[in-house]
Amino acid sequence: MRPLQRSPYSSAHILDSLMPTAFPTSRLARSSRACCAAPLLAGVLLVGGCSHSTSSAAGSMAMAAPKADPRVGLRAGETDAGEAAWNLRLLSNTPASEKFKGVTNSDLSFFGPYAIQGNYNGFQVWDISNPRTPELKIGYLCPASQSDVSVYRNLLFVSGEGFGGRVDCGTQGVPDTVSTDRLRGIRIFDITDITNPKYLANVQTCRGSHTHTLVSDPKDPDNVYIYVSGSAPVRSPNELAGCSGLTPEEDPNSALFRIEVIKVPLAHPEQAAIVSSPRIFYDLAAPPSHGEAPQDVARAAKAAAEARARGGFTATIHGMEFVLPSRFVDPMLDSVVKGRGGSGAPTADDSTALRAALPDIIAKLVGSNIRTGPTQCHDITVYPAIGLAGGACGGYGLLLDISDVANPKRLGAVSDSNFSFWHSATFNNDGTKLLFTDEWGGGGQPRCR
């Protein structure tokens, strides 16, 4: 998910901008709250996910932002929600193909007249030669959240992070806790024939790839590089040798507090491999924070009480009780059933057993109560022409020196207690400012107040 926000639903949105700008920070070079702790560049702009500069109803065009927030009172809906935009005009809204309906989209990349739309079920390729009538060229079914996509020449790179993604793109998932069938990392496709992508190879990583960023090195035209940001738990070393979830103090080879750098030989992309794992988060303290707003605490408590009354499952995380969704609970209930040698629907005893085990399960997923700085980035934006990158890394915004592309180094870091989750970063054209966005509540549970 990037600074240019796309609908989280399964349709292709084509928008026309009234104020076109040439952005040097593309996907190859990635396209007001409390004051930050320290500036990264000449000026650092912090923009929250609920910025009030959006304006005017969808379909109308205005050069100046209106004073009233037009989002107030918009109707809800999955595909027919009310819309508000400023200096953007919606040209088309094309439903997803059948295998991608109701599944979350992630990112867009471009190849000639085509838009490649990442989706948790794989990717779709749209011919947008006429943006008013996009034409689906292919829907490539290959599940693995979140399928962040990037293109370099004839190569398509796709992120995989979910535990159910398979190296063979199968849809049956991976039921085993340790399996060589699981894909968590980067998939590489040859899209010379856009209607028939060829799956060339994959590069497995310890934490998978939530997002990735392509980086070209002016000094190395024979290769392209990929910065991988993985935010999932560390996989078992029995599944991928060398993976360790211990802290760097306990294990210098820890998969935490680092990114992965993949080198892709353009003549032989199937030989792509990790060449470094820079610890760009080393020695960062826990960012400042404050508690949830009273209305959020009350709302969470009410939802949890109602869920418990219905027989639902809840968990306490950092002092607040949350309702656990069925997509989280159902696989664990199935495991309880299989663990006792049973089959079919879970029984009341199975539910009781899971409730007893949940506190330990959640504790392992969330980690200890000891707060640290970030252990990964959500996204990295690069500007190779000036040798800099911006990292939106959960609790911090980072400025990186990428003059040595394979070995990025941290130049500075800022934090802000009024930022919930540093989500994306974008440079201005002359590289003197870096814009960060905040993902408040998470992509699936957005908040705006």
Located regions from the model:
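Intrinsically disordered, low-complexity cationic segments
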Residues: M1-Q5, A12, S51, A267
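A subset of signal/propeptide-processing and intrinsically disordered low-complexity segments
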Residues: L4-S11, L46-V47, A64
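Bacterial N-terminal signal peptides that target proteins for export
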Residues: S7, S11-A12, L18-P39
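N-terminal targeting/docking segments
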Residues: A12-H13, G173
